Amino acid sequence: MIIIFIGPPFSGKETQTNLLSKELNIPVFSMGALIRKAYKEKDGKIVNAYKEYSMKGRHLPILLKFDLLKKELDKVGDNFILDNFPASKEDLAVFKDYLKEHGLSVYRVICLNISEEEMKKRFVVRGRKDDDFEIVKKRREIQDRDRVSVIEYFREMGILSTVNGEGSVEKVQKEILSELNSSK
């Protein structure tokens, strides 16, 4: 079972994917976490690309990102959750090739939505050191634009569920579980 979560920064993707991972006992992979881990481990290609792209609110090159993700996916088989991948048309093309090559399909895509006001509140509370709010806003603008083709593709497949991410963690989780159960 492959489940994908997409949404803007601070929409609760990490919280909800981790809860669902525990509930279903399947691993979750976050592009952001994989990139931050490689950055902390001083992976030269990632460090340079992160400075060039992410600090300006832009996506890292797809082949660089997907190489990190593919290493993890190849270890787990056909049951996993993805946090914010695919996030662009380019991501989607590479991911579709991966799915085809491995005979896999996506079960459900959960799109978490929040307002800019809520995003700012969560940003202030979370206070991640590597971000400032203007970069986060720019990242959201770019990601919202890039995500359109991804959302349309999964909507056309009939596997997209849009969930309001502004409720309590429990309320959002309940709605996600309801969406997943209605897919059966």
Please identify what each model-predicted range represents.
Residues 1-184:
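Glycine-rich phosphate-binding loop of ATP-dependent small-molecule kinases
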